[in-house]
């Protein structure tokens, strides 16, 4: 009756409630015009409706399919066409599978609250492969025991919802849900789904709206490859995988998600999370994940506003817990509450905003590699390491580019790598500050070739640990830092501060809490080699222990403040300082060297204490220095061979006030520090200050200076050039006489002698005063002719002498110019014939050739002379006759000659003024 040809559809159709149907129910390849509603019926055998066409609904709700005939299916409905809905809610299948493959259902397919205990030969409990459902497929809270759900290549136009279902696929199926190639025009939801023996395979799924697989539980064997697979998926909305629990991995490789992708709170016993190569238009979150034996792979992914990662992770074979190499994030990256046994890889990553890390605890990478690797990464918005960051291994930012600052919160900790480096940022391009205050590095910090637009701030940082394998300290080679290097309260332990070929736009500063302790096998504490410092060096009170501090060959545009510092050996050889060099109260255990320094300001060694352990070395060596200001050695105390200032030039004053040079006595050798009770007690002998062949405007010394036993002078001033001397009576008056005899003083020698004479007279020694005046008078009588010439030419400054010499040279040059260009000089009165030669006013007749020129003379007209013309034209005051009889023609070359002679005339006038001033000064002096 249902399938009789010509039967008209009935709005009521066939409705059976609670019927028991013994035998087969077969409507295969039939057309059913009426709705069929079989509610609560019991079917002893299988239902076969394969190829049938239903013009209305087909309902089997609350029915029981027993399949006692032994067929592998309980419902065979492949290639069925249903114009209405197919509702299988609350059915119970005792044996066999539901085969609905390649069916066309215009309405809704509902399989809610069903229990299916059977499966096909392929291990499938519900088969919808290739089916098309117009109004959605709903399988909520359904139990599949023994088989899988296969929805391969199916197309659901409204939605697909498997929420709360329980699938125990114990058969031969490869997955609990086989959904590769599935297409859903609406939502795909599998919230709270539980799978006991197989994964969920949704590879290549296409969903126009969101996909929700949250709180899914996927159990399986330990060797299960994956729990959920969404590789190559296309999701038009959000992808929500929050709270998945499973054994294997969760993969979404090469997928495309137009909304947010949420991988939060995923716990995988043996698996990992992989989104490699995926494209996520929205936020990608993987926070509070638990991967005790897995890692997170986000390499080559493209992420929208935010990438957020956090949780407990293990590592892969390469030692990486988070692999984000080549990732492209439009917005920011947040690493929050991340604990891993491996490293975080951001090599060659592109981050459009900020990289932010907080509560970070990372292990080392493979082979002891870095805990965080940002090599060649590009970060537009800066990098920030917040509170509670602890990296067991080093941080690598080699050749990275960061568009803003790089900031570390206090007490951020970094371990050392195999090379002893804790932070490696060689080649870093940073457009802001490197702010690393109070960080703790178990190894060194290396920034070779870095480019920083801001400050390099290490205030309060601890670099290196005592006894660690690191010997690096702070190393910056070939870098350019536009800001300053700030080392206040910085502690460099078991290393050194090395700056080589580095340009610093600001200052390099430390303070009394800055400590640089060299390693036991190193002889270097500080090295500034070939550095350019724009703002000065301020190391007031800095302590450099255990090695040499070499600041030589550095070019410092500003001052150098090293006062109160403690050093081993301090070297400033070849250094150029744009301001003052302050070494007040400095302490040096192994000597101070200032050789060949160039200082625009003054050098102040006031109250400094310099110790030299090698008695053959100078305590202070400042030979060949050039100081534009003063050299103040007041209160200097040294222990060594001597203070050497040979051939130094001091434009200002040199003060030898209360200078004490001593050698160690045997009783002093056991004292530590070496200058305890410095300069007092028995066994201390005075040394000598060597200032031979030096130059200073003024010398200042006092009565504390005395020559030691066996030394001719307390201060050796042989060949010194000076203009004035101030001081008190010296203990040994012979030293004063020898000083006068050995000092070359082109000006003021008599005044110096008179100064000493007044000092000796006031001290009750008139005989010594008389002898000083005799020495001075003998020197004045013995001046040579060369001394007179020097006095005349340079006594009132070098400029008059040079001006006169330049005037003569300029006249000689202009003579040569006039001789070479003589063809362009014509007579002022043109002579046309011998008859007219004697005329008072000769006139040129048209067509006639002049008989007088600069190259041809006449008895009746003065000849042209190049030298006298040059003198007459450039020095008008002489009043010669050449300029009256000869002039330059109006040709192009002639106009150039006129310009040259005009310029020469102006120059000669200026030089003449300088010469006149010098002559006037000489006459006034005489």
Language-model-detected regions and their locations in the chain:
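Juxtamembrane "helix exit" motif at the C-terminal ends of alpha-helical transmembrane segments
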Residues: 810-833, 917-924
């Amino acid at each position: 009756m249902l399938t009789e040809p010509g039967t008209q559809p009935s709005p009521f159709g066939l409705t059976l409630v609670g019927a028991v149907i013994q035998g087969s129910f077969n409507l295969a390849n039939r057309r059913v015009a009426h709705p069929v509603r079989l509610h609560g019926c019991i079917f002893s055998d299988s239902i076969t409706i394969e190829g049938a066409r239903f013009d209305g609904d087909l309902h089997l709700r609350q029915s029981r399919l027993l399949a006692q005939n032994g067929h592998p299916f309980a419902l065979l409905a492949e290639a069925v066409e249903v114009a209405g809905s197919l509702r299988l809610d609350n059915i119970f299948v005792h044996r066999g599978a539901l085969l609905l493959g390649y069916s066309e259902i215009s309405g809704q397919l509902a399989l809610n609250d069903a229990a299916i205990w059977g499966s096909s030969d392929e291990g499938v409990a519900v088969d919808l492969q290739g089916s098309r459902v117009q109004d959605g497929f709903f399988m909520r809270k359904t139990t599949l025991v023994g088989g899988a759900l296969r929805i391969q290549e199916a197309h659901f136009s409204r939605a697909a919802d498997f929420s709360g279902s329980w699938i125990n696929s114990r058969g031969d199926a490869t997955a609990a849900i086989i959904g590769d190639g599935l297409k859903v025009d609406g939502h795909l939801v599998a919230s709270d789904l539980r799978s006991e023996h197989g994964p969920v395979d949704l590879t290549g799924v296409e969903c126009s709206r969101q996909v929700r697989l949250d709180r899914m539980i996927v159990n399986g064997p330990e060797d299960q490859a994956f729990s959920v697979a969404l590789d190559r998926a296309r999701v038009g909305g959000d992808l929500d995988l929050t709270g998945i629990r499973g054994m294997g991995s969760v993969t979404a490789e090469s997928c495309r998600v137009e909304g947010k992708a949420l991988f939060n709170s995923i716990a995988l016993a043996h698996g990992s999370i992989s989104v490699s190569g995926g494209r996520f238009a929205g936020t990608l979150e993987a926070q509070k994940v638990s991967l005790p034996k897995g890692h997170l792979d986000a390499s080559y992914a493209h992420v929208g506003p935010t990438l957020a990662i956090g949780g407990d992770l293990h590592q892969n074979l390469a030692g990486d817990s988070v692999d984000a190499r080549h990732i492209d994030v439009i917005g920011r990256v947040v690493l929050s509450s991340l604990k891993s046994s491996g490293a975080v890889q951001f090599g060659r990553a592109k981050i459009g905003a900020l990289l932010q890390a907080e509560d970070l605890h990372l292990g080392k990478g493979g082979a002891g590699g870095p805990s965080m690797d940002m090599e060649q990464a590009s970060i537009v918005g800066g990098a920030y390491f917040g509170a509670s960051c602890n990296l067991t291994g080093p941080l690598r930012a080699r050749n990275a580019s960061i568009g803003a600052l790089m900031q570390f919160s206090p007490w951020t900790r970094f371990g050392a790598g195999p090379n002893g480096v804790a932070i490696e940022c060689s080649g870093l391009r940073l457009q802001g500050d490197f702010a690393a205050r109070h960080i703790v590095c178990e190894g060194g910090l290396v920034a070779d070739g870095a480019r920083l637009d801001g400050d390099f701030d290490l205030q309060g940082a601890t670099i290196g640990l005592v006894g660690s394998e690191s010997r690096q300290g702070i190393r910056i080679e070939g870098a350019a830092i536009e800001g300053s290097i700030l080392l206040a309260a910085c502690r460099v332990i078991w290393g050194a501060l090395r700056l080589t070929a580095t340009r610093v736009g600001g200052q390099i500063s430390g303070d009394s809490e800055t400590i640089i302790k060299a390693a036991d096998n190193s002889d270097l504490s500080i090295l500034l080699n070939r550095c350019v410092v724009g703002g000065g060096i301020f190391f007031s009170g800095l302590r450099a222990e255990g090695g040499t501090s070499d600041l030589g060959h550095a070019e410092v545009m500003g001052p150098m403040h090293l006062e109160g510092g403690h050093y081993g050996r301090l070297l400033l050889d070849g250094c150029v300082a744009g301001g003052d060099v302050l070494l007040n109260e400095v302490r040096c255990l192994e000597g101070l060297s200032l050789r060949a320094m160039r200082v625009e300001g003054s050098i102040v060694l006031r109250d400094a204490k310099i110790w030299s352990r090698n008695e053959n070395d100078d305590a202070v060596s400042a030979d060949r220095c050039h100081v534009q200001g003063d050299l103040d050695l007041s209160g200097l105390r040294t222990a060594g061979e001597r203070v050497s200032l040979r051939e130094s030039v001091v434009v200002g004053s040199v003060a030898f006030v209360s200078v004490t040079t001593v050698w160690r006595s045997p009783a002093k050798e056991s004292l530590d520090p070496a200058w305890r009770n410095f300069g007092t007690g028995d066994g201390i002998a005075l040394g000598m200050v060597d200032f031979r062949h030096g130059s200073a405007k003024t010398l200042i010394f006092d009565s504390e200076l005395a020559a030691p036993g066996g030394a001719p002078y307390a201060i050796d001033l042989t060949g010194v050039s000076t203009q004035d001397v101030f001081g008190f009576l010296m203990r040994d008056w012979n030293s004063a006489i020898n000083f006068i005899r050995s000092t070359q003083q082109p000006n003021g020698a008599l005044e110096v002698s008179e100064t000493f004479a007044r000092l000796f007279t006031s001290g009750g020694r008139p005989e010594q005063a008389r002898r000083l005046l005799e020495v001075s008078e003998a020197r004045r009588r013995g001046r040579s002719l060369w001394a007179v010439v020097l006095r005349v030419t340079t006594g009132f400054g070098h400029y008059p002498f040079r001006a006169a010499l330049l005037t003569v040279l300029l006249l000689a040059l202009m003579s040569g110019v006039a001789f070479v260009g003589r063809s362009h000089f014509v007579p002022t009165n043109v002579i046309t014939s011998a008859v007219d030669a004697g005329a008072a006013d000769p006139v040129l007749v048209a067509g006639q050739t002049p008989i007088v020129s600069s190259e041809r003379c006449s008895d009746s007209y003065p000849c042209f002379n190049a030298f006298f013309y040059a003198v007459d034209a450039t020095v008008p005051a002489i009043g010669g006759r050449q300029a009256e009889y000869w002039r330059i023609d109006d040709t192009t070359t002639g106009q150039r000659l006129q310009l040259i002679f005009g310029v020469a005339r102006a120059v000669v006038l200026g030089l003449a003024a300088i010469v006149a001033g010098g002559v006037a000064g000489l006459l006034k002096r005489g």
